[in-house]
Amino acid sequence: MPPRRYNPDDRRDALLERINLDIPAAVAQALREDLGGEVDAGNDITAQLLPADTQAHATVITREDGVFCGKRWVEEVFIQLAGDDVRLTWHVDDGDAIHANQTVFELNGPARVLLTGERTALNFVQTLSGVASEVRRYVGLLAGTQTQLLDTRKTLPGLRTALKYAVLCGGGANHRLGLTDAFLIKENHIIASGSVRQAVEKAFWLHPDVPVEVEVENLDELDDALKAGADIIMLDNFNTDQMREAVKRVNGQARLEVSGNVTAETLREFAETGVDFISVGALTKHVRALDLSMRFC
């Protein structure tokens, strides 16, 4: 019987709801960085080299294979700059595999606006597509196992929900969104609370329907967390023999998450121990942007 407090769909639903609020704010902040602190396409002095009434058609092409992500951010960039004056034609959707030299979308509208929004739009789509592409690679390495890939809170400041959305597009799943939707009890929480049991019992009392996860560093701490009734137990820097022993001891009474020393080389080995989740901070912390470019036609 799965732990009663944990529903893996809750985090996805919460993210998709919150992101509707976050996208306009994130785009506005990015545009203000380019436009002297305000969202005004007229502040782009280089774009003023073109006549105001010049119309243009542009294409955005990927230079390498990957997974596309960022459609709504691109749309929001041009909505904020020019309302409905820019028309976007999409050839892909978020989560689609893309291939080198493929046209992913086209733009038609005022040339000044296309140039002003180019870098901001590409910054979002290259970053998010880069994350989605790496996640898809990791998910492929887990094929045939029962282990699910999770992200973490190790995200670029200001882009938490965007990066976690990219993880979903790549086929991964979300760990907690922040500090309000799940308990994650670590060493210092335990010391301050007095014991694992006291910390877990207090968490259940405060928020009975919120999942409680406990991080452990050895098998004795695992036993304590299990006896306390933790929903999820995070195995921090366990070796594979310890992971197998943890799976045996828990025997389905809680879910097990592996964290620490996870790379593309170790991922499969860790999954084959039988753990439920592997969380990888590098997915949203060490971001390699996918190579896309915009060209006027």
Swiss-Prot record:
<feature type="binding site">
    <location>
        <position position="119"/>
    </location>
    <ligand>
        <name>substrate</name>
    </ligand>
</feature>
<dbReference type="InterPro" id="IPR022412">
    <property type="entry name" value="Quinolinate_PRibosylTrfase_N"/>
</dbReference>
<dbReference type="Pfam" id="PF01729">
    <property type="entry name" value="QRPTase_C"/>
</dbReference>
<dbReference type="GO" id="GO:0034213">
    <property type="term" value="P:quinolinate catabolic process"/>
</dbReference>
<feature type="binding site">
    <location>
        <position position="215"/>
    </location>
    <ligand>
        <name>substrate</name>
    </ligand>
</feature>
<feature type="binding site">
    <location>
        <position position="186"/>
    </location>
    <ligand>
        <name>substrate</name>
    </ligand>
</feature>
<feature type="binding site">
    <location>
        <position position="236"/>
    </location>
    <ligand>
        <name>substrate</name>
    </ligand>
</feature>
<feature type="binding site">
    <location>
        <position position="176"/>
    </location>
    <ligand>
        <name>substrate</name>
    </ligand>
</feature>
<dbReference type="InterPro" id="IPR002638">
    <property type="entry name" value="Quinolinate_PRibosylTrfase_C"/>
</dbReference>
<keyword id="KW-0662">Pyridine nucleotide biosynthesis</keyword>
<keyword id="KW-0328">Glycosyltransferase</keyword>
<protein>
    <recommendedName>
        <fullName>Nicotinate-nucleotide pyrophosphorylase [carboxylating]</fullName>
        <ecNumber>2.4.2.19</ecNumber>
    </recommendedName>
</protein>
<keyword id="KW-0808">Transferase</keyword>
<dbReference type="InterPro" id="IPR037128">
    <property type="entry name" value="Quinolinate_PRibosylTase_N_sf"/>
</dbReference>
<dbReference type="InterPro" id="IPR027277">
    <property type="entry name" value="NadC/ModD"/>
</dbReference>
<feature type="modified residue" description="Blocked amino end (Pro)">
    <location>
        <position position="2"/>
    </location>
</feature>
<feature type="binding site">
    <location>
        <begin position="259"/>
        <end position="261"/>
    </location>
    <ligand>
        <name>substrate</name>
    </ligand>
</feature>
<comment type="function">
    <text>Involved in the catabolism of quinolinic acid (QA).</text>
</comment>
<dbReference type="GO" id="GO:0009435">
    <property type="term" value="P:NAD biosynthetic process"/>
</dbReference>
<dbReference type="Pfam" id="PF02749">
    <property type="entry name" value="QRPTase_N"/>
</dbReference>
<dbReference type="InterPro" id="IPR004393">
    <property type="entry name" value="NadC"/>
</dbReference>
<comment type="similarity">
    <text>Belongs to the NadC/ModD family.</text>
</comment>
<comment type="pathway">
    <text>Cofactor biosynthesis; NAD(+) biosynthesis; nicotinate D-ribonucleotide from quinolinate: step 1/1.</text>
</comment>
<dbReference type="GO" id="GO:0004514">
    <property type="term" value="F:nicotinate-nucleotide diphosphorylase (carboxylating) activity"/>
</dbReference>
<dbReference type="InterPro" id="IPR036068">
    <property type="entry name" value="Nicotinate_pribotase-like_C"/>
</dbReference>
<comment type="subunit">
    <text>Hexamer formed by 3 homodimers. Homodimer.</text>
</comment>
<dbReference type="InterPro" id="IPR013785">
    <property type="entry name" value="Aldolase_TIM"/>
</dbReference>
<feature type="binding site">
    <location>
        <begin position="152"/>
        <end position="154"/>
    </location>
    <ligand>
        <name>substrate</name>
    </ligand>
</feature>
<feature type="binding site">
    <location>
        <begin position="280"/>
        <end position="282"/>
    </location>
    <ligand>
        <name>substrate</name>
    </ligand>
</feature>
<dbReference type="GO" id="GO:0005737">
    <property type="term" value="C:cytoplasm"/>
</dbReference>
